[in-house]
Design a protein with these regions (language model features):
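Boundary/entry segment of secreted carbohydrate-active catalytic domains
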Residues: 1-35
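Conserved, mostly hydrophobic/aromatic
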Residues: 8, 36, 87, 139, ...
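Active-site beta-loop-alpha junctions enriched in small/polar residues
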Residues: 10-13, 49-51, 89-93, 141-146, ...
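Aromatic-lined substrate-binding rim segments of carbohydrate-active enzymes
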Residues: 28-95, 103-104, 156-183, 228-237
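Glycine-enriched alpha-helix->loop->beta-strand junction motifs that scaffold or abut catalytic
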Residues: 40, 205-212, 238-241
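Hydrophobic residues within beta-strands of alpha/beta enzymes
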Residues: 44, 137-139, 212, 242
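Active-site cleft segment of glycoside hydrolase catalytic domains centered on the general acid/base Glu
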Residues: 65-69, 96-209, 221-233
C-alpha cells in the first residue's frame, strides 16, 4: 500500500449546519474542516442515495444525501483541499447488511433492468458530480454488501446477480474516469470466512477493482486479533489494498 488514508464521513455536514451545529477543538469553536485538516484527515466520505424522500416529498433525513446535497458538500470539502470517497448505496436510504431496499423507481425492475439502472444511475450521477468540481479520489460501489444489494434479486447467495449489479456500477465508473480507484465494501470485518467466501465468488464473476473496504464495530464484529488476521489474509489472498 502506497499510503495510509485518514478520513471521516461528513455526509450530514450541511444538514447539521442548517440545524446550527458548532464544532470545538479544546474548547475553542472552529470550522469543522479546519479541525479535520489540522488532525491530518485527507479524505471525506460522502454517501449518495437515489431519492431520499417519501412519496409525498418529505425528506427521510440523516443528511438527505441526494445528488444536489452530495454535490454541495462535495464542492465545499473539495475546495478546502480534501479528496472525496463517493459511496453509491443504490437505495433511497441506508443500505446495510440488514436491508438493501431497491429505490422506489426501480421496485418493479427485473434483473436486466436493474443492471442497466445501476449503470445509468452511476454514469449520470458520477459525471455530474465530477463536472461540478468535486474531487472524487475513490468510489465505493454499494454499501456493506455482505448480504448483497438490490434485494431480492441481488441477495446472497445469488452471486451471479450481485456480480451483474456491482459490475455495472464499476463499468460506469470506468467510463467516466478509469483512473479513479474502486472499493468493494462489506461489514463484519473480523469474519474471515465471510470475506473469503464473498470475494472468491465475486472475483470469479467480477470486474477488476482496487480496494476491499471493511466495516468493523468491536461490539459486533469480533476481536482486534480477528480483524488483523482477516485483513492480512485477504490482502495477500486477493492481492488488494484495504
Amino acid at each position: 500500500m502506497s499510503r495510509f488514508i485518514k478520513g471521516m464521513d461528513l455526509s450530514t455536514l450541511l444538514e447539521l449546519e442548517r440545524c446550527g451545529a458548532k464544532y470545538y477543538d479544546h474548547g475553542k469553536e472552529r470550522d469543522i474542516l479546519d479541525i479535520m485538516r489540522d488532525y491530518d484527515v485527507d479524505t471525506i466520505r460522502l454517501r449518495l442515495w437515489n431519492d431520499p424522500y417519501s412519496e409525498t416529498g418529505e425528506p427521510y433525513g440523516a443528511g438527505c444525501n441526494d445528488l444536489a446535497e452530495t454535490i454541495a458538500i462535495g464542492k465545499k470539502v473539495s475546495d478546502a483541499g480534501f479528496g472525496i470517497l463517493l459511496n453509491f448505496h443504490y437505495s433511497d436510504f441506508w443500505a446495510d447488511p440488514g436491508k438493501q431496499i431497491k429505490p422506489k423507481a426501480w421496485k418493479d425492475f427485473g434483473v436486466d433492468e436493474l443492471e442497466q439502472a445501476v449503470y445509468d444511475f452511476t454514469l449520470e450521477n458520477l459525471t455530474r458530480i465530477i463536472e461540478a468540481g468535486v474531487n472524487v479520489t475513490m468510489i465505493q460501489v454499494g454499501n456493506e454488501l455482505s448480504n448483497g444489494l438490490l434485494w431480492p434479486e441481488g441477495k446472497v447467495p445469488n452471486y451471479d446477480n450481485i456480480a451483474k449489479f456491482v459490475n455495472a456500477g464499476i463499468r460506469a465508473c470506468r467510463k467516466v474516469n478509469a483512473d479513479i480507484p474502486i472499493m468493494i465494501h462489506l461489514d463484519n470485518g473480523g469474519n474471515n470466512e465471510l470475506y473469503v467466501r464473498w470475494f472468491t465468488n465475486f472475483i470469479e464473476r467480477g470486474e477488476e477493482f482496487e480496494y476491499i473496504g471493511l466495516s468493523y464495530y468491536p461490539f459486533w464484529h469480533g476481536s482486534l486479533d480477528q480483524l488483523e488476521f482477516n485483513m492480512n489474509d485477504i490482502a495477500k489472498r486477493f492481492n488488494k489494498d484495504l
